[in-house]
A protein has these predicted regions:
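Structured beta-strand/loop patches that form or line metal/cofactor-binding pockets in enzymes
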Residues: 1-50, 317
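Active-site beta->alpha loop and helix N-cap motifs at the rims of alpha/beta catalytic domains
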Residues: 133-144, 163-167
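Catalytic domains of carbohydrate-active enzymes, especially glycoside hydrolases
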Residues: 149-161
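Catalytic core of soluble alpha/beta enzymes
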Residues: 160, 165-290, 299, 326
């Protein structure tokens, strides 16, 4: 069996980068239910468009996703190796793929009676988290407040969005960040493919002359510019973190070309573990980028040498009964069987309240 739940409500701040901006959350929770009543949970997020109504979401799921799931063992779904060809190499109409992986692996770990991170082979229970602002469109005041609070909470590193048409603005933000968090902890930058290789090299040189040592630059050039990534990497002034926008095959090519120092992965459980194996074969460090409600902590704990997981202060917490604990800049795996997240019984009501409050604020402001 399965259950789908649609959520739509405003964000508590603008979220975006040099390329995109979003002010609303549109999510579908997918619950896969086995014969014993255990529930595997996954989240399908539409970042830039409103999801259709619940009936249409279910129609698409029933037509495109459910035939491949119905009657299958979670272990078979999790471990199967597929090689689609021709017209079968395509995405579903709605972004169900990652959510299905999350739900399947959650259900499999529950059936084994262990936390997912333990089932994946982890020998530690916590990993450092860095504070990520998704801050390109924030005011200077909101930017400084966000990172100042993150520093007080003990986060181990800080990543800001850069790639503004005026490089002076990026430099200004780096100056503000250092004022907010102090001089010692690592700083990362993410232009979200805003530059070409020479622009990235020039920007890094300007930042360095201004006294900013950059721990990594993330996706500095378009994802298919392998030669550009290699140019930046050869300079040796900072680490190149790449791979966020690539599927597993693209990540393999990135590693084979020695085009990154760090491979960025997210929350497709099986794909992340395979990518982690490939990265280990090439002696490349893995970093966990944004994953919905930090579900990626399970893979971060299990993969060798992962030192960083991204935390970006998004208002998702009310959707689940309990989030992953974060203390002194360390995020911990859950002790409960599965990946650790359970949909809150009050999630729909909480989202309606947030949406109503947002509408009231908008009317008042008008």
């Amino acid at each position: 069996m399965y259950k789908l739940t649609r959520f739509q409500y405003p964000r508590d701040r603008s979220v975006g980068d040099s390329q995109v901006l979003t002010t609303e959350i549109n999510v579908a929770a997918i619950e896969l239910i086995d014969a014993g009543g255990r529930i595997g949970l996954g989240f399908a997020q539409s970042l830039f468009s409103v999801l259709p109504d619940s009936a249409e979401i279910e129609r698409i799921f029933l037509e495109q996703a459910w035939p491949g799931l119905e009657g299958k063992l979670p272990s078979a779904l999790a471990l199967a190796v597929r090689r689609p060809r021709g017209g079968n190499v395509r995405r579903m109409t709605l972004p169900f793929e990652e959510a299905i992986q999350q739900a399947v692996w959650d259900l499999l770990a529950q059936q084994q009676g262990v936390p997912l991170w333990q089932m994946l082979g982890a020998e530690r229970q916590s990993v450092p988290a860095y504070a990520s602002g998704l801050d390109f469109h924030l005011s200077d005041h909101a930017f400084s407040e966000l990172f100042g609070n993150a520093a007080e909470q003990g986060y181990r590193g800080f990543k800001i969005k850069v790639g503004h048409p005026e490089l002076e603005r990026d430099l200004h933000r780096l100056n503000l960040l250092r004022q907010a968090v102090g001089p010692e902890r690592p700083v990362m930058i993410d232009p979200n493919e805003a530059w070409n290789a020479q622009q990235a090299i020039d920007a890094l040189a300007i930042f360095e002359r201004a006294g900013h040592r950059i721990f990594w630059v993330e996706d500095p050039v378009p994802r298919d510019d392998i030669d550009g990534l290699k140019m930046i990497r050869r300079l040796g002034v900072t680490r190149v973190n790449a791979g966020e926008y690539l599927d597993l095959s693209g990540k393999r090519r990135l590693l084979e070309q020695r085009a990154c120092d760090m491979l960025n992965v997210h929350a497709q459980v099986g794909d992340v573990m395979r990518a982690g194996w490939l990265a280990s074969e090439h002696n490349v460090e893995v970093t966990l980028g944004n994953s919905f409600l930090e579900i990626g902590v399970n893979m971060a704990l299990a993969l060798p040498g992962v030192r960083w997981l991204e935390y970006s202060f998004q208002n998702f917490d009310h959707l689940v009964e309990e989030t992953f604990p974060i203390r002194d800049g360390m995020i911990f795996g859950s002790d409960r069987p599965g990946h650790g997240l359970r949909l809150s019984a009050g999630a729909e009501q909480a989202c309606r309240a947030i949406a109503a409050a947002g509408a009231a604020t908008a009317v008042t402001a008008a």
